[in-house]
């Protein structure tokens, strides 16, 4: 059967918060079956646990940020959540010493390295998937996202930037995880921003940790990073990386096709909320025989 997964052992890393510019320590701890993903703020007078769920995503201006009813925040979670989804991790406690997850290199690859180093272990409880049975869509002024029934996991995304750096590359990408590898084709795509946005954020006390080491920065015409892009279409691949992380906030892998145009964290979260508010549109699924699961999920990294 397809079982739930956690890490074999704890592992830590230190990085910089994208917005605060402060050093942040991150520690990933194994957790029992059915725990889900829980963030723990250890920098507060009393540690506070924040379980990942769509209803707690209450700030999506610059990232997916969890905010509790007492105002405790955990921000910039989407790249780490994307790595958990790509590695098939169900249960984990994430200790963090600040209000945001470190940005690392702006992609999910450093987080995947942490997971690989710690190793994964199956747990004696069936993994629960969410199977989409009916299409669900959210639309707002030309921006849209939708989930459709699909026997696997597939993402089709398009972006639209009238800018020379974007016009040189495809702005639409489809990735069917029955045939494509998250690790090789998505995890290394970095976040991106425009020089004028960076200046605006810094003037407003944000983006203090941002640099060419953890983001693709674009001026009026060119990519400023001396090494260039990791993929010709790295921009839209990063949007796929983000979407995978945003969707995993639902707490289970989705058996569905996700598509979107100019989508971002806010729309991805609205889509999850609409799905959960439409009980006839989805069901839980588990698999006694791994071969009965869609082939998209046969490629999860093996246990070491």
UniProtKB/Swiss-Prot annotation:
Cofactors named for this entry: Zn(2+)
Catalytic-site annotation from UniProt: 265
One example of a Gene Ontology biological process annotation: lipid A biosynthetic process
Pfam family, one: LpxC
Keyword presence, Hydrolase: yes
EC number: 3.5.1.108
Any one GO CC term of the record: membrane
Top-tier EC class: hydrolase
Keywords, comma-separated and alphabetical: Hydrolase, Lipid A biosynthesis, Lipid biosynthesis, Lipid metabolism, Metal-binding, Zinc
Pathway linked to the protein: Glycolipid biosynthesis; lipid IV(A) biosynthesis; lipid IV(A) from (3R)-3-hydroxytetradecanoyl-[acyl-carrier-protein] and UDP-N-acetyl-alpha-D-glucosamine: step 2/6
GO molecular-function terms, A-Z: metal ion binding; UDP-3-O-acyl-N-acetylglucosamine deacetylase activity
Record carries keyword Lipid metabolism: yes
Binding-site positions, Zn(2+): 79, 238, 242
Catalytic activity: a UDP-3-O-[(3R)-3-hydroxyacyl]-N-acetyl-alpha-D-glucosamine + H2O = a UDP-3-O-[(3R)-3-hydroxyacyl]-alpha-D-glucosamine + acetate
Function per UniProt: Catalyzes the hydrolysis of UDP-3-O-myristoyl-N-acetylglucosamine to form UDP-3-O-myristoylglucosamine and acetate, the committed step in lipid A biosynthesis.
Family recorded in the similarity comment: Belongs to the LpxC family.
Annotated HAMAP family: LpxC
NCBIfam families associated with the record: lpxC
Protein name: UDP-3-O-acyl-N-acetylglucosamine deacetylase
Gene assigned in the entry: lpxC
